[in-house]
Amino acid sequence: FGYSGHIPEQVAVGDVIQVLNIGGVLGICDSVNPDRGQPFDARVLGCVLQFPFLGERIGVPARVGYHRLDQAAVLDTHGVPIVALAGTCMEAGKTAAACAIVSRMRHRGLAVHAFKATGVSLRRDILAMEDAGARRSQIFTDFGIVTTTAASGPALTRTMLTEMTQGKPDVVIFELGDGILGAYGVEAILSAPDIARSLTAVILSAN
């Protein structure tokens, strides 16, 4: 849809890499959608630091995510109804549908939690769900995953379903970014027997 690329084996100050999406994913661009034009170049200035020790000016390299993904995570939805939104492709209207459902349920007084399980790191969609009325939200990036695959998608979904059903909301809604047959792991998620059994409804957006 836009750009695809890879992570360089190493970077140094002064190197030029590319901005691969509006969520700030950086890397070496391998292919370009002609409709989008060339990606922006970004020159490496240094490493982003975080300061985990209160009162100490000791910086350590920042990492994506505040949790480490457990590939052996066990699914527990705590009896909460689950609605999944999938699509035939990108830009099929999944987020718009999710936001409309969240808004309507919130209008009826229901507590709704929402998350995005697959895709490339970009908080825009879950922020839109929050704006629509979701009480809590999450995205796969919170677990250190910048781009999902079939290898990470099922474990991410189990983990987020378990976390987002804690506190017993009335319903959890989650979006599966990209298409069912795309490279981001949607097919693997929907094919997982335990995840499939946990779903109350699946809504398909077609384009």
Task: State the predicted function of each range.
Residues 84, 171-173, 203-205:
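Structural motif
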Residues 7-17, 188-200:
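A short, gly/pro- and small-residue-rich
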Residues 46-69:
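N-terminal pre-Walker A segment at the start of P-loop NTPase domains
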Residues 62-120:
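Walker A (P-loop) phosphate-binding motif
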Residues 20, 24, 80-83, 92-96, ...:
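Conserved active-site and cofactor/substrate-binding residues in soluble primary-metabolism enzymes
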Residues 1-47:
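Long, basic/Gly/Ser/Thr-rich N-terminal segments
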Residues 106-194:
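ATP-dependent carboxylate-amine ligase catalytic core
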Residues 179-181, 198-207:
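Conserved Switch II/interswitch segment of TRAFAC-class P-loop GTPases
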